[in-house]
Amino acid sequence: MARSIGCAVMVVGDERQAQSGQLLVRLLEEAGHNITQDRTIKPDGLQIKGELAMLTQSQSSQAIFFTGRTGNALRDPIGDAVRQQLDRRLDGFGDLLRSLLYQEQGSRAMLAQGVAGSIERKLVFCLPGDLNTIEIAMGKLVLPELEYLLNQLTPRA
């Protein structure tokens, strides 16, 4: 059996985005992972950066998930706020997510902003708030590789 990974879930937005956080929590728990934080924060770049800084110092969270407000509109600050803080980027995540979404949505998939990478040996994922997109991202990309990705961040003796 795979190890249980401590996961923080941050919903950026309001009650409309709350369902995306609930879905993330359910999928992570069903996969056997432990939810260390689960809360909603304002769509403000400075607050997102502050939460991210706090979570990267936490000993209980090895993976951090942001959802909601990842689009290209000016009111969607997650992608830029997190991307600026990453030590290493996992650009293939966004590419693969858009490819999977293209199969269902067509050209609208180019607007999807999936961001992933690491900060201080913690994985960070930014997922759109759309429930179908979360199901696809978690089921086909994140959950199958989460433990492997964390192992890549751990120095070998």
Name each model-derived stretch.
Residues 1-157:
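Non-catalytic beta/alpha edge segments that cap or flank active sites
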